[in-house]
Amino acid sequence: MLRAVRGGRAVWAPRGGSGSGSGGAKLGRPLRTAAPQRSDIFRELGPRLSRLGQALRGQLPESEGAWNSLRPHQNSPPPPERADVVVVGGGVLGWSVAYWLKTLENRRHGMRVVVVERDPTYSQASTVLSVGGIRQQFSLPENIRLSLQSATFLRTINEHLWVPNEPPIDIQFQPSGYLFLASEHGAATLEAGVKVQREEGAKVALLSPSQLKAKFPWINTENVAVASYGLENEGWFDPWSLLNAFRRKAMSLGVYSCVGEVTSFVADTADNTPGMPRGVGRVKYVNVRLPDSPEQQPVSCAIVVAAAGAWTGKLLDSATAGLQGSLTLRRLPIEPRKRYVYVWHCPGGPGLETPFLIDTSGAYFRREGIAGNYLGSMSPPEGREPDVGNLEVDHDFFQEEVWPRLAHRVPAFRSLKQVKSAWAGYYDYNAFDQNGVLGPHPQLPNVFVLGGFSGHGLQQSPAAGRVAAELLLHGSCAAVDVGRLAPGRLWGSEPLLEAAIV
């Protein structure tokens, strides 16, 4: 959903019920959807995943094999007893920071970096269940800079992540741009955002309704006051390919990959360390539970990077639960939020020139391939967040909320008859202000938090990983000032609001 949390009201995308406004008008006939099944995407997109597996073979070090690395490791080696840095979370942010630590260190047999991932199938990982968008159309300079630098990285990805004697990396980037639509109510906010984007170097055009209609004749411009269209570095790509490219390269540089779950921290606190101030601690060990085993392996370390995606908040809650009474950790407000994605077929739809469109209502869609398929969804209304205890898909949500809005904006979508497939994934949602959290924890200074990006972590992962590595290695980052994204803002500061959260 595109919104800024100000007084509970949307700024760019006014929210209404499914019957409020023309964007929520009910259509006259029901839409058939497939029977709700937890595994829709894996059942219906099985052939695609099979092709993906073949494409990934050889993309990882031969000691593991690409596709096998995405399955449970039957004989995964335990983690080493000592590490300089333990990265908790093997998603794209975790592997990005691991890669950058070894790259910027620039010496062989240097620091020992271990990435711990509890689910090597990535069955619930935000990375691989993402729709893969990248844009610079944000309202905050930090987000614009991170996405611009990430776009540059992706354009030159083989200069960074290619492994000698391996095939070139192809993330299947589709440079079709993002198209944000604003109503009269949201026009000023969108125009102010474009001004900041241009100041930061992003190429974004403002379109009047007549210009919008001339460029995209299939759009119904009713209630659209202005639109912004990304001219460069925007579109979408394959998240699997980026994740595996980071992982493959990092492992070739000597990063250890470990399957397991970090269950607890052992830390110096005022209770067990003379001179340690109360309320502050320093992690000495992490305990890693090995797969299918009650055993836990302690790993001594100097730094912990908490990059567990939607479970980063839960990680710190559970891992610090056993610390002594002098250290009561403030809760990190990063939590999972379930989001649905639907795929439909519409041969008479917008076609190959389709951008990633964000409607005034908050509904979105983009083209999926070249055979008349599209995917899209929207965030649920406030107060109607779905249960995060499973990844079941609510098919009624598409018929009652998503489809009416998109069919109003794109009349060709009125003719679609059935959703082909659907899946659910998790946002690593920062409930405080929906922006990334990047920096050392105030109470555990050697625990570096990297998460809470609320839907834009994948696209910013190349730059965010580099910034995190530079802060850890050098204490500063010249390229992007991320001081305002530090964890300290989460307690007692004003929210750092981003107007363009989808």
Language-model features: where?
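Central helical "cap/lid" subdomain
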Residues: 289-354, 395
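Extreme N-terminal leader/targeting segments of oxidoreductases
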Residues: 2-85, 100-111
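C-terminal catalytic lobe of FAD-dependent flavoproteins
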Residues: 404-502
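Dinucleotide-binding Rossmann-like beta1-alpha1 core, especially the glycine-rich loop
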Residues: 131-215, 362-364
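Glycine-rich FAD pyrophosphate-binding loop
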Residues: 102-127
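Active-site lid/adjacent beta-loop-alpha segment flanking the redox-cofactor pocket in flavoenzymes
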Residues: 331-333, 346-446
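A conserved short coil-to-beta-strand element within the FAD-binding core of flavoproteins
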Residues: 209-211, 258-284
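Short beta-strand to alpha-helix junction loop
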Residues: 141, 145-148, 180-189, 229-251, ...
